[in-house]
């Protein structure tokens, strides 16, 4: 057993988990439960009253957090200590949304001035493009942006841009390319005019396989359509640490934006990686996005554990994963603009906490990161919600909804909200056999049939959920929401004593992919790998099965 599972608090939580009353009873015996188990911060309201938790549960979870030195670990992250120990890096995505007045030291120097300089450079670039001052090689203004990246360099900008669609500049369109599948970029290029298209290449090394391949294809298309190599600088910019490679490609050094080792890819949308966002919504709105995240940073860093929104959400998720064998967590967004958030949170959580050894290399003997999945309401109610209500697995849920719609048409939003709240109520209370039987009382079914159908209509309830509300989806509230999930992820990793900031599984896939690529291009059939891999590679070389 690890020190964590040997601890008296862990053992107490394990025993306590078997004795928590049904939520129906918890609500019936405490009319003030919502008031006691809801919290407002940074433009968000968290209702966590529909959880399998009592005051004793929360006390034990907060004790577990304290005994795991959570507060000290939070301070260490914000202070720029080397908490990504396997890569010997600080973790300072929070510095990207700091104020100009702050001082944050990384590797012996204050990094805030460089962050502010980059924001100012972004401001000038965005102004140049959106005003029409930036011209393509034929003198036309830019109408289309193509963001080329992968992982955090792709998903963050895409999902945030999608979420903030009401704030877009109507004169610009943005297209996102990530997959190395040639179909992805080919379909995008069919829509574009090379004279008015600007490509943003985002890769720290300027060598990420998928990103470089897509960028080279974009340049070939640009040159084939009439552009010259000398025109590349008017249509390609880069976010990278490798200035030499970017300039060799044809990008003007003045149009290269920096990346830093102390920012992980899945936490990078707040940096120049967010340039596509800034172009679409403007720098004022981009700064509002940063400001909302900064407010959540301040809340996370300073609020006591018992009143700390990311801490509470992280602890409750851990509670279900480690003491109720919950293997997944569903995120349900009741706002069409937020439909991409489950995929973003999936990458954030699963890449961060999909680990199986502690910081000192000991194998864990407890579950770590769950599978994160989800979708938008009300679509899911006609699909996978069935499993949430009557399936055998316990799947905690997060419901996210703005109180006000950007498109208040008729009763649409009233119906959306009623479905959202109704789902949380149904998951909590369920339906008993007697209730199901009573509903069938006036039906034409026989007594035997009623008994049978009633059994099928029983729902156990006691299914946990959080509800997150905001007045309206704005850059600021979106920033706070994303930062909330970042810090929630950190909380769990800190208690599990794992490194939430490396991704060696991703790196292994890259290494083996490059090896396979070389074998695909070889002159002889492959026979050096396992039988399955040899066969698959050789079938691919033949081009038929």
From Swiss-Prot:
Keywords for the protein's UniProt record, in alphabetical order: Cytoplasm, Gluconeogenesis, Glycolysis, Isomerase
A Pfam family this chain is assigned to: PGI
GO BP annotation list: gluconeogenesis; glucose 6-phosphate metabolic process; glycolytic process
SUPFAM superfamilies recorded: SIS domain
EC code(s) of this entry: 5.3.1.9
Gene Ontology MF terms in the entry: carbohydrate derivative binding; glucose-6-phosphate isomerase activity; monosaccharide binding
Active site residues according to the UniProt entry: 351, 382, 510
GO cellular component: cytosol
Keyword Ribosomal protein: no
EC category name: isomerase
Domain of life (superkingdom): Bacteria
Keyword Isomerase carried by entry: yes
Catalytic activity: alpha-D-glucose 6-phosphate = beta-D-fructose 6-phosphate
Pathway: Carbohydrate biosynthesis; gluconeogenesis; Carbohydrate degradation; glycolysis; D-glyceraldehyde 3-phosphate and glycerone phosphate from D-glucose: step 2/4
Localization: Cytoplasm
PANTHER family: GLUCOSE-6-PHOSPHATE ISOMERASE (PTHR11469:SF1)
Function of the protein: Catalyzes the reversible isomerization of glucose-6-phosphate to fructose-6-phosphate.
Family (UniProt): Belongs to the GPI family.
Protein's UniProt name: Glucose-6-phosphate isomerase
Gene name as annotated: pgi
């Amino acid at each position: 057993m690890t020190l964590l599972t040997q601890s008296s608090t862990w053992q107490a939580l394990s025993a306590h988990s078997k004795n928590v009353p049904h939520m129906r009873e918890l609500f019936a015996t405490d009319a003030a439960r919502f008031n006691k188990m809801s919290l407002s911060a940074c433009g968000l309201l968290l209702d966590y009253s529909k959880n399998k938790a009592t005051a004793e549960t929360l006390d034990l979870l907060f004790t577990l957090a304290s005994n795991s030195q959570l507060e000290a670990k939070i301070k260490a992250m914000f202070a720029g200590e080397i908490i990504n120990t396997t890569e010997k890096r600080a973790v300072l995505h929070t510095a990207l949304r700091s104020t100009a007045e702050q001082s944050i030291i990384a590797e012996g120097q204050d990094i805030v001035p460089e962050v502010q300089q980059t924001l100012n450079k972004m401001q000038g670039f965005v102004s140049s493009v959106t005003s029409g001052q930036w011209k393509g090689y034929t003198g036309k203004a830019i109408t289309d942006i193509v963001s080329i990246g992968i992982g955090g360099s792709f998903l963050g900008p895409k999902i945030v841009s999608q979420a903030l669609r009401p704030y877009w500049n109507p004169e610009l369109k943005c297209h996102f390319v990530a997959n190395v599948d040639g179909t992805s970029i080919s379909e995008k290029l069919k829509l574009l005019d090379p004279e008015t298209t600007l490509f943003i290449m985002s890769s720290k090394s300027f060598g990420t396989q998928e990103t470089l391949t897509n960028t080279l294809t974009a340049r070939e298309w640009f040159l084939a359509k009439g552009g010259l190599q000398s025109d590349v600088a008017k249509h390609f910019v880069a976010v990278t640490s490798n200035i030499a490679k970017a300039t060799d490609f044809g990008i003007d050094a003045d149009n290269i934006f920096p990346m830093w080792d102390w920012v992980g890819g899945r936490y990078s949308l707040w940096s120049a990686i967010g340039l596509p966002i800034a172009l679409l919504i403007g720098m004022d709105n981009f700064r509002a996005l940063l400001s909302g995240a900064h407010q959540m940073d301040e809340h996370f860093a300073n609020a006591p554990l018992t009143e700390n929104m990311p801490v509470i959400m992280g602890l409750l998720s851990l509670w279900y994963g480690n003491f109720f064998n919950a293997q997944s967590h569903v995120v349900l967004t009741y706002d069409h603009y937020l439909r991409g958030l489950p995929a973003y949170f999936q990458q954030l959580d699963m890449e961060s906490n999909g680990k199986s050894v502690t910081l000192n290399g000991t194998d864990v003997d407890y579950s770590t990161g769950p599978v994160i999945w989800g979708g938008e309401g009300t679509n899911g109610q006609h699909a996978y919600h069935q499993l949430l209500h009557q399936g055998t697995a316990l799947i905690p849920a997060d419901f996210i909804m703005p109180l006000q719609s950007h498109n208040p048409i008729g009763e649409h939003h009233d119906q959306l909200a009623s479905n959202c709240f109704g789902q949380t109520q149904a998951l909590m209370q369920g339906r008993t056999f007697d209730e199901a039987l009573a509903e069938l009382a006036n039906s034409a079914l026989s007594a035997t049939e009623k008994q049978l159908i009633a059994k099928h209509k029983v729902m156990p309830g006691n299914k946990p959920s959080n509800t997150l509300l905001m007045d309206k989806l704005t850059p600021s509230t979106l920033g706070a929401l994303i930062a909330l999930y970042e810090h929630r992820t950190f909380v769990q990793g800190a208690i599990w004593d794992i490194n939430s900031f490396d991704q060696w599984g991703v790196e292994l896939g890259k290494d083996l992919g490059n090896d396979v690529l070389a074998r695909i291009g070889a002159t002889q059939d492959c026979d050096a790998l396992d039988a399955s891999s040899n066969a698959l590679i050789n079938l691919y070389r033949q081009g038929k099965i």
